[in-house]
């Protein structure tokens, strides 16, 4: 299934939706630099872009920025961002408990 998104972004390199999907795939693969390249071509105000930027910031350890992106995406109706925000809150609690 990921191959479909890879092909789509190669065929339509400036399409915002193709870039959002490709960014999500790269985040799953752990290629944060490539995900940034795709996110930079996506619609900056789309809820999916904001959510993916939140995931990126979370993976980079920038919880404050991640929270901001998740809240913005959630305000635009992203259910995924709400779930990610909840996970981030749990991570902060774990970090506080375990002294990270």
List each language-model region with its residue ranges.
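Short coil turns that delineate tetratricopeptide repeat
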Residues: 13, 44-47, 76-78
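Start-of-helix register in tetratricopeptide repeats
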Residues: 17, 48, 80-82
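Register position in tetratricopeptide repeats
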Residues: 28, 59, 87-95
């Amino acid at each position: 299934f990921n191959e479909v998104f890879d092909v789509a972004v190669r065929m339509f390199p400036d399409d915002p939706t193709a870039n959002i999907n490709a960014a999500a795939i790269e985040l799953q693969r752990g290629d944060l630099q490539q995900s940034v390249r795709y996110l930079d071509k996506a619609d900056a105000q789309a809820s999916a872009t904001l959510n993916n930027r939140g995931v990126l910031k979370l993976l980079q350890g920038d919880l404050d920025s991640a929270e901001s992106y998740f809240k913005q995406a959630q305000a635009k109706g992203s259910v995924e961002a709400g779930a990610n925000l909840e996970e981030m809150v749990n991570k902060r609690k774990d970090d506080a408990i375990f002294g990270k």
